[in-house]
Amino acid sequence: MHYPIEVAGLTRDLPLFPVTDTLSIAAFIMLGDPELTESCARELLKKAPAFDYLLTAEAKSIPLIHEMARQAKAHRYCVARKRMKVYLGNALRTTVHSITTKGGQELFLSEDEAKLMKGKRILIVDDVISTGESLRALEDLVRQAGGIVCGRMSALAEGDAAKRTDIQYLAPLPLFNADGMPKV
């Protein structure tokens, strides 16, 4: 089963995958799709507030944030990592429970990136905002670093996220019943 969606002037067929016996989600994957990544970045930047740094979580939205930084001529962007690495130094840490990840996971912000964020305007970017848990975790890292969240953006807002007034997005994405029909 697939769901056709138009986003940033392009149409893509998104495959559906079950999350539970009664819930399926459409997989929106920009990895390997430079045309979609470039178009979404361009359209998001048209809506973006002024920012000092962009922030996302590993891994699916890295191409999007990279392209946004390139188009905005930003010299640096930040990525919260899913695993602690020695080169992250005295990293900041938070926990996230995402709809697409079984169980909880941690996100880490490097010591160097945390120092960059202090007192700066941080624009949080994700490929899809759904439950808002990943967004909440990124906001927590920004607060820990002493940064200021100036905006929250995504290519798609899934399910009830499309009703939020504190995010900017390009297109809504429904959740689906097990039979592939959009939930209402």
Which residues make up each language-model segment?
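Short, glycine/charge-rich flexible loops or terminal/linker lids adjacent to PRPP-binding catalytic cores
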Residues: 75-122
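A short helix->loop->beta-strand "cap" motif at the edges of active sites that frequently abuts
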Residues: 73-75, 146-147
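Gly/Ser/Thr-rich loops at beta-strand to alpha-helix junctions
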Residues: 58-64, 131
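Short glycine-rich phosphate-binding loop at a beta-alpha junction
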Residues: 51-58
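PRPP-dependent phosphoribosyltransferase catalytic core
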Residues: 2-4, 136-184
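Active-site-facing substrate-recognition patch
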Residues: 1-51
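Conserved acidic residues
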Residues: 52, 120, 150
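Short Gly/Thr/Asp-enriched flexible loops that form oxyanion-binding sites at enzyme active sites
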Residues: 64-72, 139
